[in-house]
Each structure stands twice: as C-alpha cells, then as structure tokens.
Amino acid sequence: MREDEGLSPPQYPGDDTRPTSRKELAGWYSYSWAAEVFTVCAMGSFLPITLEQMARDRGVLLSDKVTPCQATWKAPKQLSPHETLSQTLINALRYGRDVPGASQCVVYIFGVEVNTASFAMYTFSVSVLVQAVLIISMSGAADHGTYRKVFLLTFALVGSISTMSFLSVVPKLYLLGALFAIIANTCFGASFVLLNSFLPLLVRYHPSLLRGRNEISRQGAMGDDTWGNTSHDVNNVTTPLLRSAQVDNGTITENAARVSLADTSLELELSTRISSYGIGIGYIGAVLLQIVCILVVISTHQTTFSLRLVLFVIGLWWFVFTIPAALWLRPRPGPPLSCAQDGKQHSWPGYIIHAWKSLGRTVIRTRRLKDIMLFLASWFLLSDGIATVSGTAVLFAKTQLGMQPAALGMINVVAMLAGVFGAFSWSYISRLLNLRASQTIIACIILFELVPLYGLLGFIPAIRDLGFLGLQQPWEMFPLSIVYGLVMGGLSSYCRSFFGELIPPGYEAAFYALYAITDKGSSIFGPAVVGIVTDRYGEIRPAFVFLAILILLPLPLMLLVDVDRGKRDALALSAELEGSQELNAPTYGAVPCNRNDSESAVVQSE
C-alpha cells in the first residue's frame, strides 16, 4: 500500500494520518521488549530483596535490638574449581541459603522501628500512590498536543537511569535506594500507559485496516454515502478502538451501522493481534534477562553488590532498547485541548484539572451501572491481592525460608512460564466445561485462595512439627509459584474481556481508563497492610491471614455481577448519552466537554 493511499485528511494541525509502517510497529514492540523487564525482573524479583537486604545491612536483630544484622548475612561459598555454575544453581534451588532459617531484622527510620521486609513493602505502596496520581494528572497533556512521545521517552530515560543508579547505592544510603525505586516504578507505569495510548492509532491507520475500510465503503456507496462523507471526529482520534456508528439527525443510518460494525470487527481483531505480540515479545525478553540475572548473581557470589549489579543490568536493558522506539515510533500528535472558556490554550494546571474533572465525570456515570461498580470493586481487591502476594512471597522466601537470590529469581521464571501456560489452558478448560467468563474468574479466585491458605498451615502445630508443608521449606515455593502463575494467566485473560461486556457502547476509552486506574491504584493498600502486620508481629507469616481475606472478598462481589442486567444498563446509558450528544474522550477516564458550534462547523467543513 502506498504512503498516500487511503490517507484521511488531517482533522487538526499536526494530525498524522500516514499509514502505520512496519518500522513504527517495530518501535512499539521494541519498548515492550525494553520495559517489561522492569516489572518482571526488578519489581517481581530483585528490587524487593535488594531494598530488604540494604536495610538489613544497616539494621539490628529484632531479638536483641543490638546485634548488627550485617553480621548475620553469610555469603555462599566461593565457586570451587570443580563446581560448575549449573551445580551451584541446583544447590541454590535445593537448599536455599547456607545459613538455616533467617533472622528477623529491624531498622530505625527517623526514629521509627521498621522491619526490613516492611521497608520494601512500604516503598512499593508509596511508588504506586505516586504512579496513580501522576498517570491521572498527565493524561490530559499526554492525549492532546505533541506530548505523547516526549513523555514516553522522558519517563523511560528517568526510569532506566534510576534503576541503573542502584549500582552506586551503598547500604548506608538505603533510603536513597527507596527513592530510586519509587521513581523507577512510577516512570515505568506512566510510560506503559503512554505506550498503550499509541495502540488505537497504530490500529486505526494500519494498512490492512485502511484497505478493508475502503473496500467496505465502496461496497456501500450505492446504498448510502454517509460513511464516505463523514470524517473522524476531532475528539475521537486518539480514542477507543470501538466507536459508535455515525448518526444522521439522531438516527443511525443502515450503511453507517454496517460499516461501523465491520470496521469495529477489523479493529478488534488487529488490536488483539498487535497487543498479543507486544505482550509476548515483552515476556520473552523478560524471561531471557531473568535467566541472565540469575547467572550474574551466582557468578558474583550472591552478595548485596550482586543484587545492585543486577538492577544496573535491568536498567541498562531498559535504556538501550528504548532507543529503537525513540527512532522509529512516530509522535502521532493528539488534538488540541480546546475547552478553555476564554479560547486560549490550556496551561499545565489546566491540563491537570481537565484530567481530574474528566475522571470524576466517568466515576459519577459509573454509579448508575451497578454491575460495573461490583466488578470494579472486585477487580480492585483482586489486583491488589495479585501484586501484594507477589512481593510478600519473595520477601517471605528470603527472610523466613533463607532462600538465596538465585533461587528467588527462579521462582519468578517458574511463575511466568506457568502464566503463559495458564493464558492458553484456561480457554481450553472453559470450553471443555462450558464455563462463562464470570465462572472462569471465580474458579481462578478459588484457586488463588489456596496460596495464602497453604501458608497458614504453618501455624498448625502438627504440621509445624513435620518440618515441611505450610511453607516451611524453600522447595515449597515452586509449586505455589505454579499455582500463582496459572491464576495470573487466567485472570489477565478473562477480567479485561469480561469488563468489556459491561461497558456502554461507544464509551470504551473512558471506562477502560477507569479499569486501568483501578488496577494500578489498588496496590497502594495491600503492601502497606502487610508491612504494618509484619512490624506488629515481627515476621511475615501472620500477613497470610490478611492475604486470605483480601483474595476471598472479591468472590461474593463477582457472584453478584449479572452480565445480562449489566448489558441492559450499559445500552440504556449509552443511548441516553448519545441523545445528549456527549462523546467519549481520549483522556484517562474522560468524557470530554462538548465542542462549541464553531468547532463542529470546522470539522464538518473539513
């Protein structure tokens, strides 16, 4: 397809309607390859234990509040000439650390006693809070004007450099390490939201979609020329992959409806394929780097420096593979934000206020959709449980099972492989048992509940006397990581698609934005509560009680969701909003203000 074939006229200054190129897609995939390693290798494995270990190196034993914890860290033996790297890895998986068990340590932060494991959990909670506020606040500026790519590259640069900076953080500066972790996680989350905002545009201007759209338009030209004379709305250009049909004097024309449905089908198919490729490429890169990190940790004798070196490698990977994205990904500017009453361009505070007001409007409308509210409440708890269990498990394995960093890294590899398997197997299981999406999600919740319940078995005296079961031995972490991965694969596959069935047609962008905010903002609470429980009892195991409750709470909420009722309510709200001529918006959780008549006239004339 030629560059100018099927080219839509620009709808605003700077509008880039060129067909999506292979190089542009490669740039989009490149950033997924670059940044996914942070959430998998850093947040999922090495960052929590690095923060805990640096705090431990400056802490004292909980038992006497005097003995330095640094003295309790015994590095594994040096590699002997006759011991291969693979043998060392096997020993790490089998035996954990050389020191049986692990001593609980505390550190004093501004005079407050904090368990070293809690220190890592508190850091994660703060980073999620900052990330959620930043994502909402920047959404207006990111979706309007030329800021999208600039923000993406800026966050990638700051996040990768913050991760690499761990190499210079010595234990006595462990608070600086926490600051770097907060900055890195915040930048990662913000950059991925920006990356995902490119997806609708890559799909909309993809050559295959343009060809299909033109062919459908030609076929319907004899019956109705509405589609051919209707351009994309200015406020709709960065939006939802799903769009409502064109309306003519309040009535959806037959050809417009047919074209819109066909166009939507093509977009959904293409967006699913591109998104799946991006996720797959990101996870392949993460697994490869995770294995490299494990080998680096083993070859450098699993010291605190080993952990800092691994984080440097992760940050370097993030930085280097962002370069192709910087070179190949087009800016794809969004429409200017033209809602200021005085007609002037919005200032930065104006963009921020617009973003929060837009989110508020969507939340208010959500109150009228009972089933969406039930699902989002359930998803809020589920998402919090998923993130909290991951961090808690790694820190529990380190501080109470005494597992070495290499073994902790392998736990994550096993969980990821199980997640990939789960993403495919749950679909087969659902078809085999004729399960609806909601029933599959409920099955995942029940299976997920087994993880904290298994940890609670360690409180039963008879099981505790056995010396195994109930998470008393390092090897028990690996079967549980398989269960966790299977659950993750199922929930990630089904929750988003199930939520899509409840959304008012034509308002997907606003409600999926609310879904994403619920996902990203939920993890503020779980890690903080685990940290408080750990500080109170001096160990992590009692926090399994909280995790069991947190994972169980979504179950009754999900059982209350009525899909048929939710669809009816969504259609009713959509019809009401269409009647009032309100259009869905590109900003995070936005349903934008109406344009004035002069703006509408400009669009129609173009």
Curated annotation (Swiss-Prot):
SUPFAM superfamilies named in the record: MFS general substrate transporter
Protein family per UniProt: Belongs to the ATG22 family.
Subcellular location: Vacuole membrane
Residues carrying covalently attached carbohydrate according to the record: N229, N236, N249, N596
Matches recorded under InterPro entries: Atg22 (IPR044738), Atg22-like (IPR024671), ATG22/LtaA_families (IPR050495), MFS_trans_sf (IPR036259)
Functional note: Vacuolar effluxer which mediate the efflux of amino acids resulting from autophagic degradation. The release of autophagic amino acids allows the maintenance of protein synthesis and viability during nitrogen starvation.
Keyword Zinc attributed: no
Keyword Transport tagged: yes
Source organism, top-level taxon: Eukaryota
Record-linked PANTHER family: AUTOPHAGY-RELATED PROTEIN 22
Annotated Gene3D superfamilies: MFS general substrate transporter like domains (1.20.1250.20)
Keywords: Amino-acid transport, Autophagy, Glycoprotein, Membrane, Transmembrane, Transmembrane helix, Transport, Vacuole
Organism: Aspergillus oryzae (strain ATCC 42149 / RIB 40)
Broad class of the protein's primary localization: membrane
Protein name: Autophagy-related protein 22-1
Single GO biological process annotation from the record: autophagy
Membrane spanning residue stretches: 31-51, 116-136, 150-170, 175-195, 278-298, 309-329, 372-392, 406-426, 441-461, 478-500, 512-534, 543-563
Gene Ontology CC annotations of this record: vacuolar membrane
Record's bilayer topology term: Multi-pass membrane protein
